[in-house]
């Protein structure tokens, strides 16, 4: 069983990423954890290294992919969102067959996409489901090296700038998957990074994704039980 590296990008309040790091340390104590952030965000104990970059908080998707590229991590890693708690060991044995693994959306994938989400004009996706438009979640991605993120950043910079604020990472994942440039594998979100609604109905996933502000208190409460601290 080999330990895996973890990478996350975050700016602003660090309560949730601190809990993420503690959960990784509980179940993957020997893993390297890389924190990418701006010059204002507080430091986080327990990470292996911190990369501080110039970030545009109005264009978080661009800053995120730029950070993953600038880290230049030339070894396998899981790139993970910060509203997540790891609840069992995640090892490289999960990722032995392919160079890249994407998190496949399954929860509420048939819901119709909101064409004015966060003020974005997504009218080009009218009458399409969220699963059709964004089949992959950007909350949990495995890559063998940083080249994948350089390509994703190039894609994001080539599309409509409205996606630089939101959905840009998912746009890039769909486009790069369709390009067939990489040897891709897929892991269902219910297995690798489930929302609480799924995680309570089946065998425990590897991690729980407390997506959205409404689940922040739930993440804190779960961490208190899981980690024995807030």
Where are the regions a protein language model picked out?
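N-terminal anchoring/stem segment of glycosyltransferases
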Residues: 1-59, 72-73, 147, 179, ...
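A structural signal for short, well-ordered beta-strand segments and their strand-loop junctions
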Residues: 34-36, 78-81, 86, 101-103, ...
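Short, polar loop motifs at secondary-structure junctions
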Residues: 35-43, 84-90, 190-193, 212
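Catalytic core and acceptor-binding pocket of nucleotide-sugar-dependent glycosyltransferases
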Residues: 133-219
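A structural signal for well-ordered alpha-helical segments within the folded catalytic domains
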Residues: 15-18, 62, 66, 167-175
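A short acidic, often aromatic-flanked loop/helix-cap motif at beta-alpha or helix-coil junctions
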Residues: 41-43, 55-61, 108-110, 191-197
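GT-A fold catalytic core of metal-dependent nucleotide-sugar glycosyltransferases
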Residues: 52, 61-115
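Conserved catalytic core of nucleotide-sugar-dependent glycosyltransferases
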Residues: 94-159
């Amino acid at each position: 069983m080999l330990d895996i590296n973890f990478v996350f990008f975050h700016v602003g309040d660090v309560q949730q990423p601190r809990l993420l790091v503690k959960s990784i340390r509980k179940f993957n104590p020997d893993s390297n954890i890389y924190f990418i952030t701006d010059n204002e965000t507080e430091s986080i104990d327990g990470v292996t290294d911190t990369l501080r970059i110039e970030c545009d908080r109005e264009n978080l998707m661009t800053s995120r992919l730029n950070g993953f590229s600038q880290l230049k991590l030339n070894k396998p890693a899981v790139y993970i969102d910060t509203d997540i708690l790891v609840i069992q060991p995640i090892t490289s044995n999960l990722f032995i067959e392919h160079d890249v693994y994407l998190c496949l959306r399954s929860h509420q994938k048939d819901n119709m996409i909101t064409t004015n989400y966060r003020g974005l004009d997504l009218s080009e996706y009218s009458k399409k489901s969220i699963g059709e438009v964004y089949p992959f979640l950007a909350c949990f991605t495995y890559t063998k090296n940083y080249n994948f993120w350089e390509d994703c950043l190039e894609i994001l910079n080539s599309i409509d700038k409205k996606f630089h604020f939101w959905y840009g990472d998912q746009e890039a994942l769909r486009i790069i998957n369709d390009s067939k440039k990489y040897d891709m594998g897929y892991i269902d979100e219910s297995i690798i990074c489930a929302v609480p609604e799924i995680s309570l109905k089946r065998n425990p996933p590897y991690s729980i994704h407390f997506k959205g502000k409404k689940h922040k208190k739930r993440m804190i409460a779960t961490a208190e039980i899981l980690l024995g601290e807030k």
